[in-house]
């Protein structure tokens, strides 16, 4: 990669991160294109050369997070391959991801409704795949089916995605927060999915 190409990539990532921080701070709907352009150091007209639309940028940020969530399941698969339980590895991966991408979690939680119906539908499919993969990983023998299985996957995914935000920054040491998250989730899973592989 040439020095110019590397600089362009670096500038793009910087601008994208600045846009994400602005959306997270003010809310997607409260940010105008003019304000967004000024915040990332561009003119309003040149902003469209970098991002097709404000909505497309939000979609990319949330889609990237969902792809990273899917990748957290790989940590559980690796743990199983080493003969270890999957859930602690998955929980630790979610904890770390939340520490690294807290702003994206905020956007996905709060501003998903600002996307088009088509964008929301695509992300809903990605989220369902993630939730199904999560259940298959931690409870492959579950007897739940149909709506109960889907609802359980949604609840478990939501807990994994929300607990780090609730626990981080509460004055707990990191290892203490992670242990508390593991304890909470293990309790939920043991009571709901008695045959879960934890």
List the model feature ranges, each with a label.
Residues 1-2, 96, 132-140, 159-198:
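C-terminal peripheral helix-coil segments that are non-catalytic and often amphipathic
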Residues 2-3, 61-88:
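Amphipathic alpha-helical linker/stalk segments
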Residues 3, 11-14, 18, 22-56, ...:
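Helix-turn-helix
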Residues 25-29, 80, 101:
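Short coil/turn segments at alpha/beta junctions that flank glycine-rich nucleotide-binding fingerprints
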Residues 67-70, 74, 97, 117-143, ...:
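Amphipathic alpha-helical packing segments from all-alpha helical-bundle domains
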Residues 85-109, 157, 194:
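Helical hydrophobic small-molecule/effector-binding pocket
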Residues 99-118, 165-168:
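Amphipathic alpha-helical segments used for helix-helix packing
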């Amino acid at each position: 990669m040439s020095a110019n190409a590397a600089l362009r990539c670096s500038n793009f990532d910087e601008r994208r991160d600045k846009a994400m921080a602005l959306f997270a701070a003010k809310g997607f709907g409260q940010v105008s294109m003019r304000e967004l352009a000024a915040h990332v150091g561009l003119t309003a007209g040149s902003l469209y050369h970098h991002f097709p639309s404000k909505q497309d940028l939000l979609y990319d940020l949330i889609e990237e997070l969902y792809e990273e969530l899917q990748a957290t399941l790989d940590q559980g698969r690796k743990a199983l391959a080493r003969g270890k339980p999957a859930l602690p590895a998955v929980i630790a991966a979610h904890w770390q991801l939340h520490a690294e991408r807290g702003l994206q979690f905020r956007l996905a939680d709060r501003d998903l409704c600002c996307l088009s119906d088509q964008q929301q539908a695509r992300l809903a499919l990605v989220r369902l795949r993630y939730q199904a993969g999560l259940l298959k990983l931690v409870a492959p023998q579950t007897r739940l089916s149909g709506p109960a299985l889907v609802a359980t996957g949604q609840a478990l995914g939501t807990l994994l995605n929300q607990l780090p935000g609730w626990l981080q920054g509460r004055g707990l040491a990191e290892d203490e927060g992670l242990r508390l998250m593991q304890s909470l989730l293990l309790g939920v899973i043991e009571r709901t999915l008695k045959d879960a592989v934890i």
